[in-house]
A protein has these predicted regions:
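A late-sequence structural motif
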Residues: 137-173
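Central regulatory/effector-binding core of bacterial HTH transcription factors
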Residues: 1-34, 103
Length: 173
């Protein structure tokens, strides 16, 4: 059994899936509908504004976009689905966040926020352990409630090996 993980845009992943370069495609984005693919997993994934424990904004019942605009942010790169959603929320109010750091690794961003380096906007599955441990606080930002979809696809004509079926079952949990 060989497991190779690749990162790519949704379009690139679906093209690779369609040309049989990959067996499965896992996305975190807006809902995707592809008639030539089987949708094996389709789950909601909340995206959260998080701050280090003890941050002044964490004490507030609600945080406005104007308050966020004045904060130091560590974000994923432009073009990432949830980063784009944050930028759109801000732009709708005539605001923008200019992050002092952009990284491709959401896990590393989470760790940096835990160490007090700024705020971030990350999927709940990335931050859930830190929230439970009390090292991060989730900010309540009513003007920017974002939910993406975790989706796993395979080609409709693809024969699924036992290992692929086991992986799909693992992701479904």
């Amino acid at each position: 059994v060989e497991l190779v993980l690749r990162t790519a845009t949704d379009d690139e992943m679906l093209q690779m899936l369609g040309s049989n370069q990959i067996d499965l495609a896992y996305t975190l984005d807006k809902p995707l509908l592809q008639p030539s693919f089987v949708l094996a997993v389709d789950e909601p994934e909340p995206i959260c504004v998080v701050a280090p424990a003890g941050h002044p904004l964490a004490e507030q019942a609600e945080v406005t976009l104007q308050e966020l605009a004045g904060q130091e942010f560590l974000l994923t790169e432009r073009g990432m689905s949830y980063r784009d959603a944050l930028d759109q929320c801000m732009a709708a109010q005539g605001l923008a966040i200019k992050p002092f750091l952009e990284l491709g690794s959401a896990s590393l961003l989470c760790q940096m926020v835990e160490h007090g380096m700024g705020l971030s906007f990350l999927p709940e599955y990335i931050v859930q352990n830190a929230l439970a441990a009390g090292t991060l606080s989730r900010l309540n930002v009513p003007a920017c409630c974002v939910e993406m979809r975790r989706q796993l696809f395979y080609h409709r004509d693809k024969w699924l090996t036992p290992q692929m079926k086991a992986f799909i079952t693992l992701v479904q949990r």
